[in-house]
Amino acid sequence: LRGAKPTAALESSVARSLELAPGETLVVAVSGGPDSIALGALAARAAPAADARVVLAHVNHGVRPRAWQDEAVVIALGTALAQTANVRVAVRTLGPGSPDEARLRDGRYAALLEIARETGATRIATAHHARDQTETVLLALFRGTGPTGLAGIAPERELAPGVHLVRPLLRVDPLALRAYCSAHHHAYALDATNVDTSLRRNAVRALLDGVRPQFPGLDEAVARCAEIARDERERRPRAELRARLRDQLGDALGETSDVSFERIDALARALEAGRTGRHFVRRGVEAIVEKRNP
């Protein structure tokens, strides 16, 4: 990860993952750690080409005594990035509250959603990376998970109507993110609790760090497994929907042997996404998807 080439490759990869729309406002959750600092900088790097705006959203939970340092590095990043891109910083202070991780996460997402609503953003990007994915899948395995747990962290999910969470760094190693921060002189804060192995995720992280030298492709392998599990989970309901559609078309048309899989699959995807309109089924036959009144 030396020199300009790895930096440029990372910028191109993240820009492709983000796929910023022209004029879009993207909220980036920035805790102040190296991963989210890098994501904020990478998003700002991609923004001008799409005439997009980036909002660096920082949530101060009021739990950690040195939380002011996290906020300071986020504000400093926003100031630096605003010189070359349309970037602003939004800070929310929630504390003091419960140190329970689930409650902190819920409060953080609620604050991020509020910022998205205020700024007109439809997407919130978080800095979950490849090692986060590995830890999540392994924790799920230790709990005796099924296919849902094996799917790990989703690259995208709906947080609320009209607002989606996106994770453009899920295939990126955090060492590359730290190298990016160093190459561009972006300061970041470190959370001392990340080395407390009394916490389950930290214990799993320490375990994985011990075996990575023997399994150098570990994170890529787990990422592939998670992707396969997600595909299988999503494919099953769609397969059932395709079967129902073929049965219904058979009832209506009498014969469906000349209706291609691709036509039925496209119709199934349209129904899943709630897209209305006409869909070609076969010569002289169209299926019309309409919005049903409640």
Regions found by a protein language model. Give the residues of each.
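Residues that recognize and position ribonucleotide moieties
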Residues: 105, 170, 197, 279-280
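Flexible helical/loop "lid" subdomain adjacent to adenine-nucleotide binding pockets
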Residues: 123, 129-272
